[in-house]
């Protein structure tokens, strides 16, 4: 994997530096969340089995291996050519951060589950409220998709594909597509 990932969240030292540089204070709750996320451990096999149970699908092997080794993060190159446009990839979600965190796979599944096709799971945040999705069921297991929230269905989106674009057939190819 040529793309490197920066750990999600911030250390206390990083928060202190950010506060000095920006001359603004983090709210106590945000500070606590960022520190908890920063210190989230890599998942165990049992934790990933539990995640699979919660999402109702087996994780594609390549994604499971990514979580075991990296567990989400901010990619070193965060731009992606998709179709005729360049898109932003903010970060990939984590499986072991507090469930209430915006960086949590399960938090995002709970929020968005009915807004994209049921074969997909959300694995990352993209620019402007869009998502990076991964196929966990069907004939394109392991495929990476870009979900555009601005074009979503006005009713149940669990079978709606008009705002979902396949960007890569595999996670490793998706990582190779990311650039500065």
Residue ranges of model-derived segments:
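A short, amphipathic alpha-helical segment
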Residues: 172-180
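Structured loops at beta-to-helix junctions and adjacent beta-edge loops in soluble globular domains
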Residues: 124-126, 137, 147-150
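Short, intrinsically disordered/low-complexity patches at protein termini
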Residues: 83-85, 146, 156-158
